[in-house]
Amino acid sequence: NMELTLALKNNIGEINRLHSFIEEVGEVFALPMKTVMNLNLVLEEAVTNVIMYAYPKEEHEYIHLTAKEQDGKLIFILTDSGKAFDPTQAPDADITLSADDRQIGGLGIFLIRKIMNEVKYERIDGKNVLTLEKEL
């Protein structure tokens, strides 16, 4: 059972490494280009949320991402040891507002829910664990 993992520093500069990882996931699981693009959007949003909300500015910690296929679903598990932050509790974006007036994070979870089939947040052993599933 194939499983790919990535460790990112909690730094926005790491987003390029995230994109490379998603492309690798796309190749390994033979995903259509559109799916890869959507996954890039979703994971960038999820990782950015962690960087912005879960960690104090100067704390150097890692964010771990695992991708695997199970029962016809692609599953991403994003884990960090930052402060508790449940992105699924962020209000959905008010899409009638201009981008500047929207709350940070709101559009993100709206987008994530739209693209992924299942989104689940848990706090386990002092860690944030976000599980994102997409049916293949």
Where are these regions (language model features)?
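Short beta-strand-loop-beta element adjacent to the nucleotide/active-site pocket used for signaling
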Residues: 68-76
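Flexible, glycine-/charge-rich segments associated with ATP-binding catalytic modules
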Residues: 1-7, 12, 113-136
